[in-house]
């Protein structure tokens, strides 16, 4: 049974509305002032409120405004009872959050019809809210599943750690690292176009495919061949128009050679040196279109020698494409300078980097997924 709250300082109108609505099968409670009406609403939120516009103390407009500003009460259907019928007055009421109006003197059939319509809309709002909560629960479960797929930080023989912050509950970034043999480790990070579930599913597919080495007859030690195989497998025409950028590298700890290839991805940054003023910065990137854009795309390998005590950062563009408080976009070069400045001053660089980016971001949430892999070489 729907509960209706009637707020009116006129006792006769209270009783008239109460009797009429109870005959329609509704449960009706009453209040004589705006303050009392708000307290009753907070104590037991009704499905619909009929409130007089002009009352001593809080007016109907003020009551409506306060109730509608409470997120828990925003779906309560609010009808203003008024003798005012000018356009300006109605605009004022609508701006305060009123859903409908009933003009005095009250016409019984009109009132009953407006109440029925208001309760239908309230029920629809409640149903949508229930579906929203269900969807949020399912998305939270999916998020936990995605997090369970990500690798754990490792300490030996390489120190690998990461920060992962999706822009929504589900993100399009994904990464992994796994040993191909006792001396060679594959490390990669990909960024699927878009956000949310449609971006997450292709990322999970790539992760599972590479982790299980399901692409037969593929040389996983050769990054360019891996990217070419992924490009053949994940053409966007068959993937809901989703493409992705990726950086893929293989490090051999005996030869200290890092072989890598990229597909439209930001360069990975290798830092070597002993101080901020004595740091060699290598931008590790090869030419190549994002995976899935063109069937004939070609990819090439590059390699570098890894100096002792070097640090490699692999990241998505969400790590530096951040809108600052002045409306300008932060830059890759600024991000690299932060990496350099923290390289020798603190041990847990990733925590400091993430906190810096959170403070830098001018919006409540990041506009893009943010992933940073850190590999410290001995």
Residue ranges: model-predicted function:
Residues 14, 56-57, 65, 74, ...:
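The feature encodes the CheY-like receiver
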Residues 15-23:
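Charged docking surfaces used in two-component/phosphorelay signaling
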Residues 129-312, 364-378:
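… and, occasionally, acidic/histidine-rich disordered N-termini of signaling adaptors
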Residues 55, 67, 93:
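Receiver (REC) domain active-site loop signature in two-component systems and cognate sites
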Residues 2, 32-36, 47, 59-65:
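Acidic catalytic/metal-coordinating carboxylates
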Residues 197-220, 306-364:
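Active-site-proximal, acidic helix/loop segment immediately C-terminal to a metal-coordinating Asp/Glu
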Residues 44-50:
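Active-site beta3 strand of CheY-like receiver
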